[in-house]
Amino acid sequence: MRHSLAAIPAAFLSGLAVAALADDAHTIIQNGRAFHPVEVTINHGETLDFSNQDEFIHQIYVDTPGLNYDSAEQPPGETFHIAFPDAGTFSVRCHIHPKMLLTVHVK
């Protein structure tokens, strides 16, 4: 019994560490050939998770001074992650659906 009680604080602290890491990520939903939301503000060093909840493939790219990113094709149900290490304003688009636009403000 003493052994399992000792594990409780460690498990609790481990859970807190995971929760703290999760706070650094923000989820962007791809649905209806659009990003949701269409604009987001984050801190430098944070990550955006792009979750494809559409019925078709997307291909995310960022081509802004300070950050270049081009994903592979992103099938429905998959998630890609983009880190934004520096401050600035970035445009995220989809190669396949050029009207898709997300503006990312990084502080």
What are the language-model segments listed below?
Residues R2-L5, A17-K107:
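Extracytoplasmic copper-binding redox domains, predominantly the cupredoxin/blue-copper superfamily
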Residues A6-L13:
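Sec-dependent N-terminal signal peptides
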